[in-house]
Amino acid sequence: MPPPPHIKPENVLKRAQELIAVGQAPAALNVLHEHVTSKRTRSSPIASLEPVMLLFVELCVDLRKGKAAKDGLYQYKNIAQNTNVGTIEVVLKKFIELAEKKVTEAQAKADEIQSSLESAAPSSNVEDLEAIETPETILLATVSGEQSRDRTDRAVVTPWLKFLWETYRTVLEILKNNARLEVMYQTTALQAFQFCLKYTRKTEFRRLCELLRNHVQNAAKYSAQMHAINLSDPDTLQRHLDTRFQQLNVAVELELWQEAFRSIEDIHTLLSLSKRPAKNVMMANYYEKLARIFLVSENYLFHAAAWNRYYNLLRQSAVALAAGQGTKKENPSVTEADMTKAASFVLLSALSIPVISTSRSRGALVDVDEARKNKNTRLTNLLGMAQPPSRAVLFRDALNKGLLKRARPEIRDLYNILEVDFHPLSICKKITPILKQIGADPEMEKYVLPLQQVILTRLFQQLSQVYESVELKFVYELAQFPDPFQITPAMIEKFIMNGCKKGDLAIRVDHTSGVLTFDTDIFSSAKALHSGSAAGSAESDVGSVQRLQNTPAEIARLQLTRLAKTLHVTCMYVDPSYNEARIQAKKAAQARAEAGAAKEHEETLARRVLIEKKKEAATDALQRKQREEETRKRIRTQQLQEAEKQRLLDEQREREKKRLKDEQDRIRQQELKKQLEELKSGVKGIDISEIDLEDMDANRLRAIKLAQLEKEKNELNERIRTTAKRIDHLERAFRREELKHIPEDYEAQKKRDMELYEAIKAETLKEAEEKHKEAVALKHRLSRLVPVFSSFRKEVSEKRHEEFEKRRKAAEREFEAKKKQRVKEVQERRRREKAEREAEERRRKEEEERAKREEEERIAKEEERRRVLAEEKAKREEERKRLDEIALRQKQREEEAEARRAARKSGLAEPPTRAAEPERPAERTAPRLNLASRTGGAPSWRERQAAKEATGAAPAPAPVPAPAAAPAAAPAPAAEAPKEEVQLPRRTGGYVPPHLRSGASASPAAPPSNGPAPEKYVPRHMRESSSSQPPSRTQTPPAPAAAASSDKPEGSPAPQKWVPRWKQQQQ
């Protein structure tokens, strides 16, 4: 298949504009959608792709194709997010602007349609944009032809409202959890909030809040992805907080209190993640909205606590602004009127906290239920308080901060009446004017009902302390409130029943006698006191009720306590020793405490150190566990990503296979249809209506075609044969008849041909004469122009020749100038190269001279080193000679001792003493090791150095004079023939006798040619030098050697050869 023709974005854009120009917007949208979602688009430049996307979103908005827009924008985000984020924002802003513009136009159109009707609400009454048409509306539209405003809006405005809502949701889904698109994400969320507020879209607002909440939860889940947002970043967290505060404001404006409370929880969660404190202006808005939520939910206890926190924040902001520690932008603007209003509401909300619960749907133990405790803990955390609030704590805090002075006078009087000087018989008369003032204020009117509950509670609590029974009529007269806030007897009875159900009141109502009887059972247990109720009641402790006198039950219950106190006081006055014993015990306890204070302090310090170590160990363990968890999480995330990537690849591979298979099937079906059409049009007599394409293939179709062609061929041949037979007989008859008329026809044809020839000839001659005349006339007419043409051509030639000469001379001048410039450049370059060569030559000579000096210095240093080595070597040789002499004397002594032992064993006479022994030559060194010779036969540097020293040294020293005792024995060894000995194989690294070493003669058994004594060791360089000298200069063997050898036994070896001791012992 050929490639698609529109690959470049410019071509696609041009093609789409052409389709739009001819009114084919859906086709243009399809072209743009295919190009945007194509894989080839990923390599396209962003600059050329942006106009395509702008036109794409414009067409999607015009045609209300939200799904196509979502697909294209997702693909465009994946392409451009790594290169250019700004273009994504431009396209998405354009998308939102176009959708908002369509909604505005739809509203204007609806107003136009309903201009004759009464003005109605600006928005439709459709509750859910995703469920516009209900069965009721369809039935109503069917049976009624009336055109109302709601129906007009539903038909005109609501579809565009739905599309705008889908636009916001699509953009938020595209921008979610992307740090590079975070600002655009927050801006879009704020625009969506304004959309819900402007058109009162409560259902869409709930969905929007849930959508944003899911995005934040997924941000922590997919934090390892590329470009994921980091909630630890202060700027990111601040943007999310701003969005949630706007969400809270819109929820309060729409009176969606459940969503407002969830928004409060979202804000509290984000604040707990923030590392820097929130701004005071934000927290003021937070506490104000929280107070409104608690008031709507009738949780008066936490409502009063929220007002308390709000007042504290206002006071802190005022102090910070007065001290210059903060800016007006970060702190709410506070005036004296604001502080008075806040103080009044704090006090009024605290007074409105019910003492008992007003809910009838709760059992007696509801307030101690675990769910209630968890809820109170959650609300306490939302307020940022360490412990749950109570009525007494709130009043104490208000008094400590001086709220009575700041509050309005009527609120201050109300506090004094209810909490300080409560009188049940005159309470209603005193409170009536205050309730009227509170009821006149719309904001404070909401507190009248809870105040009535508090007043009734106080009334019955104090009546139960004074009376045992009272008439119902008397109670109704006491509970009289001003006109708008009257309470009926039924409401009073309802209140009594609720208090009895909760255990806060013990009252029996007798309607027959019209009497209220208070419980006076002195043995009854204490009433259950519960903290906090569903309506936000306070903790009903005993101290919160003014005590007029003790009830009989309390007197019976506290009898033992009073007796113990009385006996204690009596003992103190009657028995002085009791008091002294108490004082002594106290002193002893103080002494013990002082004695153990130091030890306890040390133990405390040691315990503190141990605790710190445990904390560090726990912290290290926690950090290690967190690192391991992060590692496992990262590995798990990588595995999930790889699995997801593999799954996507498999799905893509399957989709590609399915697409190829579908494409092949489609092409096959098209080919089959095409062949069938060709078969139908080309071959007659075939009915293709009964052919099933599913069971048909190309071979079967070809067989059908061939069979039909064969059939047609046979029929055609039969018709041709029949026709030929018929024509053959007919033609034969015609020719027989023609033979009679052929001569006549020939003569007539010949005559017609001659006439036609003559006419054509005359016409040709006439035309030739006319053409000749016209040519001659043209020649005479043009011949007048030849001189003018020649002169004009000559002038043009001369002008062009002059111009050519001018250009040639200019070119020659330019050539000469460039030639001179080139020569100058070449000369300059050659001078520069010559200077460089001379400088290089100078540097080379200097380098050579420096190298020569260094070489001379090195040679001098080498000569000096060799001289020092030679001196050291000479010293070592002298030391070695001295050691050899000592070793030789030791050896002579050993030999003498060995000879004596041998003589004693053999029974011979004593061997010659040491005095008769000839002196050994002094020139002998340590035995040489049988080291491996150098490869190649070349002497080492030590050998060469020794040869040089031997050449320039003095002649060999004179031989040691022989003793006079044996002068005649000298020639005897020379005359004797040397004995042959078998040379033992040499072991590498072992000891080798001197006569077998490398310095000896070629024959190992023969004595040296120069004649020195075999026992005398001569260095190698001396042996080499002595071998080249004449025999006259060699040393003669000393005579005592021969004499000594003659004295030896016959079995001993020749005197010229040294025999080891172990061999001598064997012999």
Swiss-Prot record:
Disordered as annotated region, ranges: 617-665, 795-1067
Residues annotated as domain PCI: 339-523
Recorded GO MF terms: mRNA binding; translation initiation factor activity
Biased composition (Basic and acidic residues): 617-632, 642-665, 795-901, 916-926
Pfam families: eIF3a_PCI_TPR-like, PCI
Recorded superkingdom: Eukaryota
Keyword Protein biosynthesis annotated: yes
Coiled coil: 92-121, 608-899
Ranges annotated as biased composition (Low complexity): 965-976, 1025-1046
Entry keywords, A to Z: Coiled coil, Cytoplasm, Initiation factor, Protein biosynthesis, RNA-binding
GO cellular component: cytoplasmic stress granule; eukaryotic 43S preinitiation complex; eukaryotic 48S preinitiation complex; eukaryotic translation initiation factor 3 complex, eIF3e; eukaryotic translation initiation factor 3 complex, eIF3m; multi-eIF complex
InterPro entries for this protein: EIF3A (IPR027512), eIF3a_PCI_TPR-like (IPR054711), PCI_dom (IPR000717)
Function: RNA-binding component of the eukaryotic translation initiation factor 3 (eIF-3) complex, which is involved in protein synthesis of a specialized repertoire of mRNAs and, together with other initiation factors, stimulates binding of mRNA and methionyl-tRNAi to the 40S ribosome. The eIF-3 complex specifically targets and initiates translation of a subset of mRNAs involved in cell proliferation.
Family in the record: Belongs to the eIF-3 subunit A family.
Name of the protein in its database record: Eukaryotic translation initiation factor 3 subunit A
Gene source species: Neosartorya fischeri (strain ATCC 1020 / DSM 3700 / CBS 544.65 / FGSC A1164 / JCM 1740 / NRRL 181 / WB 181)
Lineage start: Eukaryota, Fungi, Dikarya, Ascomycota, Pezizomycotina
